[in-house]
A protein has these predicted regions:
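Noncatalytic carbohydrate-binding groove/subsite architecture in carbohydrate-active enzymes
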Residues: 164-294, 303
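Aromatic/acidic polysaccharide-binding cleft in carbohydrate-active enzymes
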Residues: 268-341, 355-360, 369
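C-terminal beta-strand-rich structural cap/linker in extracellular carbohydrate-active enzymes
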Residues: 409-444
Length: 444
């Protein structure tokens, strides 16, 4: 009976997710800075939260499972792209997953056979795949991410690419050359890097190792070093969002490069969801996850990230797996969903960012079209009281992380007073996420 009920519930959820979202308000489209991975799984909810971009994985082994003559386009993939585009969400594709027949290595992550042949050689199987997939989606998909987390070494848990750094550079190079031939407007992203795998295993930064390979290639400079956008994945610790992006930008500059940086995955999965009892080991609650969503987006903007995406929009696994979604598999919302709504409502139409890091708090000021948004939170286990000058000629409202509005008035000297709640910290004093943020919005 329980299994029958679960099947019915999942079927109903899938039917709901297949419904077309509300029509796009052409005068007020979603802000493309703010995305959510796999929001196509629940397009109605994505439209409601005003998700601006989506990431969709296209597995090579799904297109050509058995041989090079196959080409299978899943019909649901085409529908997802159309629905997202109609709702104002840009779809960004991630290419990965070597078919077993196309590699001498492990299926899924092996180095494609013929990778070092010229890109126009029929024996270069990866080039043939990229040429066809980019051509098929010309006009629908412009941004292409080349593989996922290549910095996880083959011997480490979670490895997704079995090649060397040199092999990944060649994978990137071939994809760049072929994609630009098919669609000159194609934008090639470096596969998202985790940062921590190099740090934990005491390896030099993967980005540095990759660029060391690139600078030896005499053709690289003329081709933008074969990638247009750098991609990072950052989880759990709020403050590392700013710090890690800054580290990667510094490395790029050391090699004379200035690339846009996207934060394609960020989140802090909670460990206290009763529907997902086997939660992560890092002590972040659902309340803390909501704080993280606001803080991570604010810090990413402060450090100059061009786009940010939450991983992920909705869970696609039952209880017992890490609960990253803003929504559970049954479409019920975690508190983080309303925090995300606050971001897509009051962090948009950005013109300028100012950032203040103090020993006990953060303050990020977003100057927007027609408004000023200030985001503040405590860094440590003590509450902090702030006095912030009111912006002349504006009306103010202050929001908690769930979007609830509270009364706020400036004092006689024209200052607002905010008390920032203490950050939740463990027994060792480690504060993974800052205290509950306040979002002060002044409108002209």
């Amino acid at each position: 009976m329980k299994q029958t009920f679960l099947r019915l519930a999942l079927t109903f959820a899938l039917l709901l997710s297949a419904l077309p979202p509300a029509p796009l308000d052409a005068a007020n489209p979603p802000d493309p800075r703010f995305g959510a991975v796999e929001s196509y799984m629940a397009p109605d909810l994505a439209a409601d939260l005003r998700v601006g971009w989506d990431r969709m994985i296209i597995h090579w082994y799904t297109r050509q499972p058995d041989n090079a003559d196959q080409w299978i386009t899943p019909p649901e993939e085409t529908d997802r792209i159309k629905i997202a585009t109609a709702a104002g969400r840009e779809v960004v594709a991630l290419l990965m997953g070597t078919p077993a027949w196309a590699t001498d290595g492990p299926g899924g992550g092996g180095v494609p056979r013929g990778l070092y042949l010229p890109a126009n050689d029929p024996g270069n199987l990866w080039a043939r795949f990229v040429r066809r997939i980019v051509g098929e989606n010309k006009g629908a998909i412009t941004h292409w991410i080349i593989w996922n987390e290549p910095d996880i070494a083959l011997e480490d848990y979670g490895a997704q690419y079995a090649g060397t750094v040199e092999d990944y550079y060649q994978l990137l190079k071939v994809a760049y050359v072929v994609a630009k031939e098919v669609n000159p407007n194609a934008v090639i992203h470096l596969g998202g890097l985790t940062y921590w795998h190099d740090l934990v295993y005491n390896r030099p930064s993967y980005l540095r190792r990759l660029l060391d390979v690139a600078v030896k290639d005499k053709t690289a400079k003329a081709h933008n070093y074969y990638f247009d956008i750098f991609t990072a994945h950052i989880y759990f610790r709020t403050e590392t969002v700013f710090n890690i992006v800054a580290i990667y930008r510094k490395i790029l500059r050391e090699y004379g490069l200035s690339k846009p940086i996207w934060l394609n995955e960020t989140n802090a999965a909670p460990n206290d969801d009763p529907q997902y009892p086997a939660g992560p080991l890092i002590p972040v609650t659902m309340d803390g996850q909501a704080s993280f969503i606001i803080q991570a987006n604010a810090l990413a903007l402060a450090v100059g990230a061009e786009r940010i995406a939450v991983y992920k929009f909705i869970d696609d696994t039952p209880s017992g797996y890490e609960p990253y979604g803003l929504f559970r598999v049954d479409h019920s919302a975690r508190p983080a969903a309303e925090a995300y709504r606050l971001v897509t409502s009051h962090f948009t139409n950005l013109k300028r960012v100012m950032y203040s890091q103090q020993p006990n708090y953060y303050l990020v000021t977003l100057t927007r079209r027609g408004a000023v948004t200030r985001v503040a939170w405590a860094r440590a286990g003590q509450e902090v009281t702030l006095r912030l000058p009111a912006t002349p000629g504006t009306k103010a409202a202050v929001y908690d992380k769930f979007g609830k509005t509270y009364p706020l008035a400036a004092d006689r000297k024209g200052f607002y007073s905010l008390t920032l709640p203490a950050a939740p910290c463990d027994k060792s004093g480690e504060c993974y996420v800052g205290g509950s943020p306040w979002v002060l919005v002044e409108t002209y």
